[in-house]
Structure formats: C-alpha cells, structure tokens
Amino acid sequence: SGESGAGKTESTKLLLQHIMNLCKGNSQLEQQILQVNPLLEAFGNAQTVMNDNSSRFGKYIQLHFQKNIVRGAKLSEYLLEKSRVVQQDTGERNFHIFYYMFAGLSLEEKQMYGLLDPSLYRYISGRFGTQDVAQRWKHKYQEVCNALDMVGFQEQEQVDMQAILAGVLSLGNVTFEPEESHGSVKVSEASRGWLKAAAVNMDVLSQLVFCVPCSPWSPSVSCCCSLCADARDSIAKVAYGRVFGWIVCKINELLAENVDPEVELREIGILDIFGFENFAVNRFEQLCINLANEQLQHFFNHHIFQLEQAAYKEEELPWETITFNNNEPILNLLLAKPLGLLSLLDEQSAFPQATDKMFVDKLNSSFKGNLHFQPGRGRVLGFSIIHYAGKVQYTAGGFLEKNRDTLPANVRGLFINSITPLLSFSLQDIAHRALTVLWLAGLLIFLCPRQHSLMVLMERMYSANPHFVRCIKPNSQKEPGVVDSQVVLLQLRYNGLLETIRIRRDGFSWRPSFEEFAER
C-alpha cells in the first residue's frame, strides 16, 4: 500500500520475481506469471498528474503452491476506472494501449482499423507525444503483442480486440444534432465519417438515438442530444471494460493449475491496489479509491494495533496502551446503514428524477456537524471528506450516473447482435451480471458491482494471515533521487508507521515457537 506513485506495482513485480527465485522458478508457468505484467499495464495503467504509470485498477494475485513449486495462479481485478476511456483531466492521459497502437501499428494496419492522426480523437484529447516518446511506445506495443501471443490469443481475436479499441476512439467523435423536421435528434452530418470508422450501422445508431428516453422534466432536444452523448460514452466504457475483463479471463485460463483437485495447495496472495488520491478535481472514482484505502488502513490498524495489544492484555504483560489514528468514524460516515454516504447515494440513484444537487443537499443535511464531512463552498457542487490521509474535496457532478453504472436497455439490446463476437458476448454477460447484482442488492453494502467486488476483496483479506509492505513516495514532483523529508514524514504519520515502530520497539516483536526457543 501507499500513495499513488509510491511504487506499489513495481514492488509487486519485484516481490513476484523474488518468490519465483526462491522456488528456483524456471518452469514455463513461473515465467508466464512474470510475463503477463506488460499486458496488464498496457490496458490497465495510465498517466496521471501523480504518476506516469498509474494503475487504474486493483489486482489480487493468488499463487498456488504444492510444496515449493508453483502449480498455478489466479488474477482478480477490481474497480477498473472505465470513465478514463471517455474523459481525462488536464495533464492526464487515456489508457496506455491507445497510444501504443498509434505508435506501433503499420500504416496498412491503421487503414484497416480506420485510424487517422491521433490529434483528431476526442477520447485522447488530441494529445500524443514527442518522437522519442512515440518510439518508446512503439517498443511497448511490440511487448504487448508478444504478451498476447504468449497468453494464447488467436490472431483473429487480436484483430477483433484492436478493432474494438479503434472503434471506441472513432465512436467518441460521433456527435448529435437536432432533426428540425421531426423535432428529434440525429447523428450530425460532420461526424458520419466517424460513425463509419467505428463500424456502427447507421440504422442501428438511429434506433439508439430515437429510443434514448428524454427526461420528462426537461424534454428539450438539447437534453436528448446530451442523453445520446451519454449513451455513446456508456457504450465506449462498457466495450473497453469487457476487453480488459476478457484479457484477465484469458490470463487465468493460461495460469490455472493442472493438478488433482484432491491435492492440497497452499496460497500466497499479493494485493496491489490504488493508492490514496487527491487531485485538483476528485470525482466518484477517487471516492471509491479512497474508500478502498480507508478499509485497508482499518485492516492494518486491526492487525497491528488492536490484535497486538489485545494479545499483551490476554497474557497479562505489563503494557501501556498505544493510541493510534482510528479511522472507524470515517468508515461509518461512508458505509453506515441506512444513513451513510454510500447508502444515501444508493437511495438517490434508485430515483430516475434525482439529481446530483439533490444528493449533495441530502448529504449536507444528514452530516451537518460531522467532524469528517464539510459542505462544498461557493457555487461548486460538491463536498469534502476528512480522510485518514487528509482532506479531499469531491466534485459531485456525475455521482448518480456513475453509481448506477448501467447501460440503457435499448442500447444493450442493439449491440448484443454485434458482428464482433467479443462485443456481443460482453453485453450479454453484462446483462446477466446486472440482474444478479440487483437480486442480491438487499444483502450487499452497495448496489453497484464495483463496490460489491470491494466487499468480496475485504472478506478475502480478513481470512488471510497478512504481511504489510508500505511503499513511501519520496517526493511529489516525480523526480528521481530526490527525498522530500516533509512529504515522507507526512506519509509515515498518516499510515500509522510511526506508531508501528513504537509498538515493535516497546513490545514483543520476536514470537518464537516453543520448539524454536528450546533449540536455541
């Protein structure tokens, strides 16, 4: 764990290499476990203002052992930041793979996928990079292709995957305009070429446009144009999310153990998940990320402080209780039922007429006087949470839509019959998952799938015997060889590391078994 850019992903890779070396790992499986990283980073990482190679998803790697030999592995992914596909803030980029494609595809391949100059695409903000950067991306693209071959993607599957990615970029340039004769909406004349490049049938998209429901409270044509644009972005996010999920499934097929089910396997799990984030603009995604960090910090506190000191008291050892920064009040603010922030968000998300402003008003009235909540100031629609790592101001625009995380039923139905098997399968799978989650809603802390997956992750963590690796970010400027003492000290404080050092120094850090003690 650690802040964004502290080195969690790099440490995870080093830890995997270390474990494989301890196993004297030279088998094909052990090498494959190490070689899937370029693929995951290309599709799941992006440049942010805090980190040039920031993981925009969390991953839990389970290594299965028989004696000292790795027999298999499984990868679980959490909270992929799909909204990055359609929007990035200043100084940030889309997922790496889009830039790698532009740098690595030949001219003939770009023509086949309908790709033009990268400066033309809205989803990558018309930004590319210098010649040196493009050359580095070209090399990365080749690494991705090699990894796809190694994982077992067939040639046609790779073509389908890149066609979807290219189609996503082209779809982002499709715009809508009023249809004067019918008082409805149509695809703008200027963007019909992008529609063709996205390989979307005009009649199909027309159905999409005409059956997107306009709000009865503001049934203007401009409102319908906006809703059509939202539906377009939803398609792009779902398509990309499914490509990523497909890659994870193929990796798991490759790494699955091939042993007798009755053979007992031991397990080491490595969790590499987002660090605490505080950007100039913080949205729903940052709230989910910071909630995950709050839960992991509570998990750390529970094992290091509460269980440790409880053991001393149980054995009646002389001990002066060490206080620590307990973040339970923050978790209660976010997770309490029925009046926690996320419960109120789920409640508002259930009403089609609810707005982000109504949600913020509800928060302001419910949490008035709460020490960890502050209403937004001025005209900004938002609020602030005083997290264990510091104060974060959230912009509330889009909270309800992102929490619903749904694709309009009409859009889903139209694309189930897509000519690309992957996309067709993806939307059928999404429809099935949505129904399952809704059926389980009464039993879950959260409504939407992304938060449900976080709950499952925490259940796994509490059933394990944990070891904590704290990654410390040396400076905030992404500079090599520079240590900012104040930045480091702040992290040591809010992570609880100073208290951890004290409890280890003053307590009983060596716990030998009786047999080990007798041998000494």
What are these regions, as identified by a protein language model?
Residues E3:
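P-loop (Walker A) phosphate-binding loop of NTP-binding proteins
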Residues L14:
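Active-site signature of alpha/beta-hydrolase-fold catalytic machinery across serine-
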Residues D160, E262-R266:
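Short basic/glycine-enriched coil/helix segment immediately N-terminal to the Walker B
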